Amino acid sequence: MSIARTTITSIVNGRRVPPSAQMELRFNAPYDWARVLRFFSGRAIPGVEQVADGVYRRIVDLHGDAGRLTVAKHPRKHCLVATVEGAVARHVDDAFAARVATMFDLGADPAVIGSGLARDPWFAPLVEAAPGLRVPGAWSGFELAVRAIVGQQVSVKAATTIVGRLVERAGERVVHEDDGAPAWRFPTPEALAACDLDKIGMPGKRVAALTGTARAVAAGDVPVDREHADLATLRGAWLDLPGIGPWTVEYIAMRAWRDPDAWPASDLVLMQSIAARDPALDRLATQKRRTEGWRPWRAYAALHLWNEVADRAGGARGG
């Protein structure tokens, strides 16, 4: 997305009212807001994120300040309207707008992506059914990495529950009004590294992987965001961490590093979806060869397949 096309309007309030700011973030139509919300809703971190009444809300923090981010689709314009409330609003600038735009994949060109995938007869009907599908991102690369580690070999619902427990143990409540909206800051790497994760609901090896990753990020031993390293460096650094395998890295690459060609090959839902279309493709190696024709848009291919399953199941599946 071009930041030149982003409108940022500061709203000056009285001293007793927390500062706020509003942004209009343009996208290339069509934009499937309903399915973006469904994806976020099924994975919303308790206390940190919330999807309700067609709106996404979460706690965000930057430079030591925190506040609420609320995002809704404009009823007429091709844009999302993002409102920031609280101390963090003072940091709203082009870089902040770009971060929100990246989280909601506003820079994607659905016409180019759709035409690329629709060359495969598997995807032509999926693209026709959901032409504005996006790859939902994350506010923080570390937050998404935690989500990916916790989500190893468990259901979306189970992972969401466990991440909620992590927030309760290592996060910080930054909004104290009891209004039912998000109020918790996601744990910092330092806080999570120091947290006792006994009886958190994960196997010991996964707990060790999570704690080790938090320590590595806190120490600056591993890059977290694409602005600090290229994709090859990021993948290599994360694959070197104990307990971090290809699925975890590709999931992070898809949603946090914004690699449009990321492919979490061993994802059970994706593997089942491919095998259902061609029973001969029942092995990881043969499936990966089949995906070569989907380059450079395999992350969007994954979302289309997950979305198809979610449409049938009526809930979040995969990722």
Question: What does each model-found stretch correspond to?
Answer:
Residues M1-G319:
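HhH-family (HhH-GPD) DNA N-glycosylase catalytic core used in base-excision repair
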